[in-house]
């Protein structure tokens, strides 16, 4: 098991009343009525974000295109929330953001396919052994 990465919706830690997408929908309407603007969502993945939010009934938002360091957008006032790729959640936490309970847009992981012919090749087999050993050690380090 390696290469796990998820596209998630993250909100500021201090949004204590926002735990789910339904809560986010309420906030989006509040922002629309009180500020006469839409909830700003910073992302590098506008199509996936739009499809997900619309499928969940969230309509009062606008996409802010991110060119990088998306997790900083709420802090600098460029957006209220973000969607971004995360593996461990550490960068989100470091920026006082957290993933909504049902805020997983896309879950992914890497997969390795190896042919029997490749396994019979000593050089390729040795490379595979080194790769798998490295991944095993990395996973053990991440667990500790």
Feature-to-residue mapping (PLM):
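Domain-level signature for soluble enzymes in the chorismate/prephenate branch of the shikimate pathway
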Residues: 1-144
């Amino acid at each position: 098991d390696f290469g796990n990465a998820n596209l998630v919706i993250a909100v500021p830690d201090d949004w204590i009343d926002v735990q789910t997408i339904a809560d986010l929908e309420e906030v989006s309407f509040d922002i629309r009525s009180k500020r006469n603007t839409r909830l700003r969502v910073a992302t590098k993945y506008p199509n996936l974000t739009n499809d997900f939010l619309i499928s969940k009934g969230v309509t009062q938002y606008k996409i802010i295109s991110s060119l990088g360091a998306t997790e900083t957008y709420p802090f600098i006032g460029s957006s209220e929330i973000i969607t971004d790729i995360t593996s461990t959640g550490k960068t989100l936490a470091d920026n006082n953001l957290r993933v909504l309970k049902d805020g997983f847009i896309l879950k992914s992981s890497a997969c390795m396919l190896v042919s029997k012919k490749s396994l019979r090749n000593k050089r390729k087999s040795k490379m595979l052994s080194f790769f798998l050993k490295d991944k095993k050690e990395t996973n053990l380090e991440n667990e500790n």
